[in-house]
Amino acid sequence: MASVTAAMVKDLREKTGAGMMDCKNALNETGGDIEAAIDWLRKKGLSKAAKKSGRIAAEGLVAVAVHETDGVVVEVNSETDFVARNEEFQALARTIALVAVEKGLTDVEALKGAHYPGGSTVAEAIANSVATIGENMTLRRVAAVNVAQGVVGQYVHNAVADGLGKIGVIVGLESTGDAVVLAPLARLIALHIAAASPLALEAADLDPAVVAREKAVLADKNAGKPPQVLEKIVESGLKTFYKEVCLVDQPSIHADHANKTIGQVVKEAEKAAGAPVKLKAFVRYALGEGIEKQESDFAAEVAAAASGQL
């Protein structure tokens, strides 16, 4: 069994909103497994967490670049937030995104080996910035969205400069319709994605393991019900889950689209666009998601509630 630490309790609290002692008990009951502890809390009705989430801990920037019908998002990490405000680092992240979109690269290693303006490779440009700024930097990931016809919309949240920030989104609308209609629609959807953080475009795109996990939680929460009743409860619960995590089923956050799902908003735009519109794909990067930093400032609260030790 893994030893339960203060950092683990803090992490679980941030992911679930549950009380400290509930988090401690959950971790003890699940052998220190964070994901199992999340499910344990949900089954006990102590957490509202509905989907897997990663704590935002790394620093750096997410960069977005769009060229005609192609868009990319890249994440470049640094050691401190201070570097994210450095103009050289910002130029580096922005240029890497431009290289990726111009060359159509979605593999990190291929992007590192790509030509960087000035005669070096992307990897060499990063190394040069490390030497100049004096802080380690990493090209962590890159992803793209492309459409044959239509538009790719973008949105950057907490922007520190054009196309650079803490959350970056690109979304593709496949259509032969009027770009004057499609472009603002794509941006509104990108903004929605940044705020609502969907896991997939639609239910069929969800990881089967995520769906199976949700079914298990619903079944455990309603254990003891007759099989026929339980089946309906699980089915209803999954529909609610899909509305929370599938883009086309999510209620739009925009006041102009009140009581409409994103799927309905896109469908209704077809008349103004003059052609069918397909929501093809999206990418949402939040800076540092899935990367953990060690924490050492939680001891006081633990000491007060658990006599100094977990």
Curated annotation (Swiss-Prot):
Q: Does the keyword Protein biosynthesis apply?
A: yes
Sorted alphabetically, which keywords does the UniProt record give?
Cytoplasm, Elongation factor, Protein biosynthesis
Annotated GO CC locations: cytoplasm
Please name one Pfam family that this protein belongs to: EF_TS
Establish whether keyword GTP-binding is in the entry: no
InterPro entries the record matches: EF-Ts_dimer_sf (IPR036402), Transl_elong_EFTs/EF1B (IPR001816), Transl_elong_EFTs/EF1B_dimer (IPR014039), Transl_elong_Ts_CS (IPR018101), UBA-like_sf (IPR009060)
Annotated GO molecular function terms are: translation elongation factor activity
Q: Where is this region: Involved in Mg(2+) ion dislocation from EF-Tu?
A: 80-83
Quote the subcellular location field of this record.
Cytoplasm
Superkingdom of origin: Bacteria
Q: Which family does it belong to?
A: Belongs to the EF-Ts family.
Chain's role: Associates with the EF-Tu.GDP complex and induces the exchange of GDP to GTP. It remains bound to the aminoacyl-tRNA.EF-Tu.GTP complex up to the GTP hydrolysis stage on the ribosome.
Q: What is this protein called?
A: Elongation factor Ts
| Species of provenance | Methylocella silvestris (strain DSM 15510 / CIP 108128 / LMG 27833 / NCIMB 13906 / BL2)
What is the gene name? tsf
